[in-house]
Amino acid sequence: MENEEKREYLAKSRSNSRNFLNDSIESKNIFGVDKKSEPNLKQSIDGGLNFSTTSSYNPSNLPRTSVFVSARNLSSTVGHGKNEKKILTDLNFFLKPGSMVLLLGSPGCGKTSLMNTLALLTSNEKITGNLLFNGKTGDPNTHHRHVSYVVQDDFHMAPLTVRDTFKFSADCQSGDKSEKERIEIVDNVLDFLDLKHVQNTVVGDEFLRGISGGQKKRVTIGVELVKESNLLLMDEPTNGLDSSISLEMLTKIKNKVQQEKMSCLISLLQPGLEITKLFDYLMIMNQGQMSYFGPMNQAIGYFEGLGFKFPKHHNPAEFFQEIVDEPELYCGIDDGSSDGGSGDSGSSSGGSNYNYNFKNKASSTMMMMNNNNKIIPPLKGSDEFAMAYRKSIIYKHILEYIDSHIPDEEERSKFIDYSTTLKPYSTGFGRQLSLNVKRGFKLFLGNKASIRLRLLKNVIIGFILGTLYWKLDTTQADGSNRSGLLFFSLLTFVFGGFGSISVFFDQRQVFYSERAWKYYNTITYFLSMIVTDLPMSIVEVLIFSNFVYWMTGLNKTWDRFIYFFLTCLVCDVMSLSIIRSVCSFTKTKYAASAISPAVVSPFILMCGYMKHSNEIPGWWIWLYWISPIHYGFEGLLLNEHSGLDYHCSPDELMPPSFLPTFNTSYPVGFEGNQVCPITKGEQILDSIGFHTEFYYRWVDLAIISAFTLLFWLITLVCMKFLVFRVYRKDPVGIKKSKPNKTTTLIKMNRNSTDSTTTNNSMNYFNNKHNKKQNDDSDSGEEMESVDVDVKSSGKANLRKDIPIGCYMQWKDLVYEVDVKKDGKNQRLRLLNGINGYVKPGMLVALMGPSGAGKSTLLDVLANRKTGGHTKGQILINGQERTKYFTRTSAYVEQMDILTPVSTVREVILFSAKNRLPNSVPIQEKEEFVDNILETLNLLKIQHSLIGDVESGLSLSQRKRVNMGIELASDPQLLFLDEPTSGLDSSAALKVMNLIKKIASSGRSVICTIHQPSTTIFKKFDHLLLLKRGGETVYFGPTGTNSKIVLNYFAERGLICDPFKNPADFILDVTEDIIEIIQPPQTLPTSTSNENNNNNNNNNNNNNNNNNNNNNNNNNNNNGNTSDTLNNNNKKNLESSLSSSSISFDPVESFKESKENQKLLSIVENSIMPVGTPVAVYHGKYSSTIKTQFIELLKRSWKGGIRRVDTIRTRVGRSFVLGLVIGTLFLRLDKEQNDVFNRISFLFFSLMFGGMAGLSIIPTVSTERGVFYREQASGMYRVWIYYLTFVLSDLPFVIITSYAYVIPVYFLTGLSLSNHGWDFFYHSFISVMLYLNFGLTSIAFATSLPVEEMAFLLNGVLLSVTSLFAGFMIPPPSMPAAWKWAFYLDFISYPLKAFLITEFKDMEFVCTDNKGAIPIPIPSQNTTKFFCPITHGTQVLDRIDYKISFQYWDILIMASFTFALLVGGYLSLKFIRYQNK
């Protein structure tokens, strides 16, 4: 936003506020309605608030584009019979063009379900009642054309820029507009959302750096606004935005709604007063039922009519949300003006001040109390509120209004045509395909790291193959090598397909969203995937083919090269189609990564190389015919061997000359005669069982293409009809846990001085020793106003020898990052000369607009920055920060990264056991955790699994669990980053009550917060306010009811409106351009000073009974006083608003202020009083190695066994494949062909182990985020974490291995000599192999930034290790330059061990000359058959395997295991991709 636009906007906002305040003061009601006069309810319903464009709604007068929504008895259920569950129950409401409806309710109340119902995006729900749009039911095929639905989740294509994201949405949803109009729409939305300056920045994700979280939320809004639809639905659109940006954005939306006559429903979590005033109607939901729907200006009066009391100057949105959840809070409220506490209550016309006092039974007929002196509210529970609303006059008028405004047939024609004549898609098929292809190429080109890696992979593998099979000859050995080379070429592309798993799942949620809104037909998106993949596939195959084909000396004709290229290309595309088809019908990437190898493995096995077609049993021959790889392999062999003549080198002639009977006369010997077994390439094809007709290669290519089309079709069908998740779940019907006595007391008895001792669970955070905290003598009364409550409690602090809080100060703090500008490396300063401090008992708020550096400063103070350059001084208890800092502090991150397979209690207890000193008994640690659970209201869900964001705990619960994990360390210094982000006002207040209590217990607390309500802001006693650029606008105490901070700005001519949230006001001050108002130097407050108010309040507390007895008189007097004060406020405010304005620099003003001078004098010296005890640490970690090892092992093991689906998939996959292999090679005999069969299936077992190892990558990626957080907190040693993770997975590795080995070993009839020892030896080698492959996957997953790269490199490694294992090309045939690769290949050693065990004592025969080579005897005019292999040692000698190395192989494999362990540990310890 430019300077002039900002000035104009601020002026306009100030003018609106001025007009609104004048009206409000005159009527003595913040919503502009005089409570003393009964308004015309029908007129309020018809006109709404601030909807002055039409005095009454007349459908025939509205433009054609308007949509009037009406709902009558709208209900929604899921399930059937006993499992039926109500989602929405008998909702009656309307959405009127030109008006905005605010939807409030706690998480799980049904807000998202209602939004989905209005958008016609329900799937399994049964909808009853009437839902009409302009009097007609919505057509699911065309309804989306008129609806813009902003969902909670920010699903975007990370590599796309902001402009490209908006442009794609506009192109797909506004096809009826010209290109120029669409560009203009995108430009307008970019300006509308203030995203113009980042329009060419990628959206990004956790691994691709892009725009900020708040900007990403605005992008989510923008992709719907470019649609320019008639019905606007927004589900919590302000999450992650600060209050000033939220207000600015919603004000613009309000203007847009009024100007364009849109119908609008918006759900919000913590709306401030200014935001609430923008809405015309209010809808409150609770457990799927409607507690209120009606005009905003009637809501307070409605609830007061039910017996509740709205506190004076309280935020209405908080009142509306809390009253249905915790009605006890608003029963029997003394709306006087006494001040009962520091910041929680008090009286001042300049802020939203209120005071909870309990009246006795005689003083109010509205309040009832039970025998335990607990307040009984007039209404409680969703059923009672819904029933009361249905009996209200408002409900009656709402129904009348809905029924009277359903248009007749004539009027319906003037509205949007909802008939099926409207096309579902705004663009044609060709246009959709063009847009998707264009975006696909942008996405592809945006992932440069993947492009480089894929190209490099093909260069490296192509070079390896070219040099390994350099200039193949036409000898017998090279004939076999040609077949092995061609088989491996296919494997290279098959394994490369695994890299697409993560990409598919990364983009699937975006596709689901766009498919639901009919951006395009599914087939166009599907075709665009194929089209955008094809160029890269062509380049990859071209590079690979040129290296392999010409370097190895394959059949050197251009037509055969072209066929080789085409076959490899089609096989590459086909393998990708197989993997994508698996991904399309699996729910998670965990399942896809486990199932994909199981699908691909039989196709590899049945291709004809490992098991010749003429040897496949009849019950599996169908698998041979449906294996697409078989046709690719057959085509390549036809292309290579057809017409090729082979010869024998002297040592390849049969029988060999060293045979004892070689020169013996017939019939004993061969009389010196020899033959060359294979002289024509067709002989090789015939021996395998392949076609020998040269033309058939094109048939094979056509069949591969047909299989590719089949897998494409499977993928398309699944993508079109399957949906695993589109929107966040909204679990209505789950009863919300009732606030415990402690929490209720904290909220209700805010002015009680002994509330600390009332709360047993909170007391646990108080110090056992009744010490009074010392204040710094130089701080002065204004600079130090912390009231530390450290009363003794019945429960001792865990660390009796350690102070409960600590002293932290920072001076001239500067933080810079390296950036590149104009091709030069420069440093960008994010923090500039920040000063401040925190003491025990202080709760400091870090505030500022987006980009001010709040989180950056918190990360610097908490020592969480992993990059950049920090300057300045940070002292902890007067000393430089040491490596033991993590033992003193705790950091609650904004992102709730938690272990999904652990329970709530387990994660908190885990933190306590690892972060509390080992000297604390286990029983005390568990009691400590119990009290944390009680304090955080988590007892009812303590044994619930955390789960993921979609199916696990709610956002509020996850926030509290995250806090509990850090509180379990019993920290002296607590950092919190946006602890209320994403919470509704009730949940946010609960969290802040806890944080305030923690600070009051004597701890030092620093907290960033971006959108605090008035009530929440008053919880903070100190404020550090930053502006964009990381400069200080204010540091100091806030004062009672924010008096000190507001007076600071008032002295500079900046007056906070009496009804404005002080937090919003001070954020406005941080704008680059601000206007100040002169000459007022103080706030327009009560004529009596605050000390008198405090004294009066104390007297009121001391004489509570007298006050209660005279309550009615006091209320009357308070009403007169309120009128007088409001008149004074109005005069002062009008005088100030009419004054002149000048420019103001908040940073320079603070630098020159006395507050800054006092701050500098404090931070110049140590703020810690002399003689204060300081904890002394002797180690970085609180717990011992033994404790860490046991706790980590327990957690990892529980996490493993709770991933039931993963275990079933891993074990089931191995067992099923074991049965397939076992029955395919059933009861192997000792014939000549069984020699190769034994070798091939043993080699395949190794390959399968490598593919099975891929399934652990998603798990490692998920756990890596948790590890980063815990490691930064200093919970445990890295090597213990890594070792226990591996050990906990070892049993599953063993089970998985045995699930494959047992059926294979006994079904195939492998050796059982030495009393079965060979079986156990084989099993042990298999377990070691599976373990090594798993360790390799872990190393890749921890050392690479994204899963795609981990899958891709795993495929490369599997290809290379398979190549050098000794099966594709025997060691004697390897060039000398590549022999080292054979010895470094960890697959070669288990293959060697398998073969030595199997062949060392085995004899082979040629029954009925089967497999024997006929040797002509010319002298006798006959033929004698030669059996090539009669003993297994011949096989071992031919491949140069020594029997004596059988057990050395185990040691070598163990050394590989150790090396992989070390490599994984080093990557986990030193490589970080979540940099701050």
Curated annotation (Swiss-Prot):
CDD domains: ABCG_PDR_domain1 (cd03233), ABCG_PDR_domain2 (cd03232). Residues 743-786, 1081-1141 are annotated as: Disordered. ATP 1 binds at G105, S106, P107, G108, C109, G110, K111, T112. Disruption phenotype: Cells that have a abcG2-abcG18 disruption have an endocytosis rate roughly 70% that of wild-type (or rtoA disrupted cells). Disruption on abcG2-abcG18-rtoA cells have an endocytosis rate roughly 20% that of wild-type. The exocytosis rates of abcG2-abcG18 and abcG2-abcG18-rtoA disrupted cells are roughly that of wild-type; abcG2-abcG18 endosomes have an unusually high pH, whereas abcG2-abcG18-rtoA endosomes have an almost normal pH. The keyword Repeat applies. Residues 776-786 have a biased composition (Acidic residues). GO terms for molecular function: ABC-type transporter activity; ATP binding; ATP hydrolysis activity. The keyword Transport applies. It is found in: Membrane. ATP 2 binds at G848, P849, S850, G851, A852, G853, K854, S855. Residues 749-761, 1086-1141 have a biased composition (Low complexity). Residues 445-722, 1201-1471 form the ABC transmembrane type-2 domain. Belongs to the ABC transporter superfamily. ABCG family. PDR (TC 3.A.1.205) subfamily. This is ABC transporter G family member 18.
